[in-house]
């Protein structure tokens, strides 16, 4: 009887040890490791979207470097701030950055420009995230700006010169509801074959505008791209056509993830870019 008890006790111990080992293994199992990657439009990361057509990308990760050309913009008072994806560029009153465009940008025909902005209302004047300088004209070769700013909405206007500067286009003044103090993804596409512009906010098409005879954007002679204000608000002004305007101001908030492509992204690609960057991917 004594010997039987001795035989049973080690057996019970072995069963208990095996059970504990199994439980331990089960606790370490992570079902997420088997889950497929989340994708949008077939992309798992924002850098995958139309990657071969990307001609400029400012991630603003502690610097003002375009990762495509590996050249930096000149800083005029901007600083680092939390962005939609990592760090962003804090602009603020009187501040901006200036980038000398590469040949890839100057030679654009069809194109997309997309970026994020998070800014409060500016009661002093228009806020211009991006301005492609035209040194001989009041307005730049491309201007994108918040105008008609109200507490619950803003008109967003876009102006461009095309066809060697012979044609000038003011796109429809689209209204954005509740645009302040939150991240907005803005994207403008242009297909030169159809001469059609499309404007997206947070991945959703807001409207289109066909400009007959517009041709290629007038970027061949653009000397600089201003990020954070209009070409005539820099110090000194970048155009001989005018000086500072009292109805114009600066982006007061943060910009992030500015990308320029040499094609008109599809609606699906714009949506994918918005979704992925919004998730920090």
Positions of PLM-derived features:
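Short surface loop/edge beta-strand patches of beta-sandwich-type extracellular domains
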Residues: 35-49, 92-111, 170-176
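Extracellular, beta-strand-rich glycan-interacting domains
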Residues: 55-63, 111-121, 239, 245-276
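Short tryptophan-centered beta-strand motifs in secreted/extracellular beta-sheet-rich domains
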Residues: 115, 181-190, 199
């Amino acid at each position: 009887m004594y010997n039987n008890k001795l035989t049973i006790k080690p057996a019970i111990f072995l069963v208990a040890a095996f059970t504990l080992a199994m439980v331990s293994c089960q606790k370490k199992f992570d079902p997420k490791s088997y889950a497929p990657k989340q994708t949008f439009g077939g992309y798992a990361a924002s850098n995958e979207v139309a990657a071969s057509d990307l001609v400029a990308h400012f991630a603003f990760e502690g610097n003002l470097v375009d990762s495509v050309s590996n050249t930096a913009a000149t800083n005029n008072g901007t600083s680092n701030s939390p962005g939609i994806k990592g760090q962003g560029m804090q602009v603020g009153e009187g501040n901006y950055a200036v980038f000398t465009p590469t040949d890839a940008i100057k030679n654009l025909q069809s194109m997309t420009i997309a970026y994020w902005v998070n800014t409060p209302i500016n009661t002093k004047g228009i806020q211009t995230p991006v301005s492609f300088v035209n040194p001989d004209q009041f307005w730049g070769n491309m201007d994108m700006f918040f105008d008609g700013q109200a507490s619950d909405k803003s008109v967003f206007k876009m102006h461009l010169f095309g066809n060697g500067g012979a044609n000038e286009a003011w796109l429809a003044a689209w209204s954005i509801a509740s645009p302040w103090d939150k991240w907005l993804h803005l994207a403008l596409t242009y297909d030169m074959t159809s001469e059609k512009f499309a404007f997206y906010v947070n991945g959703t098409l807001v409207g289109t505008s066909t400009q007959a005879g517009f041709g290629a954007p007038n970027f061949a002679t653009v000397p600089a791209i201003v990020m954070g204000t209009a070409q005539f608000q820099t110090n000194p002004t970048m155009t001989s056509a005018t000086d500072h305007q009292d109805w114009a101001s600066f982006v007061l908030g943060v910009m992030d993830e500015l990308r320029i492509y040499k094609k008109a992204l599809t609606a699906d690609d714009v949506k994918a870019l918005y979704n992925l960057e919004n998730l920090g991917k």
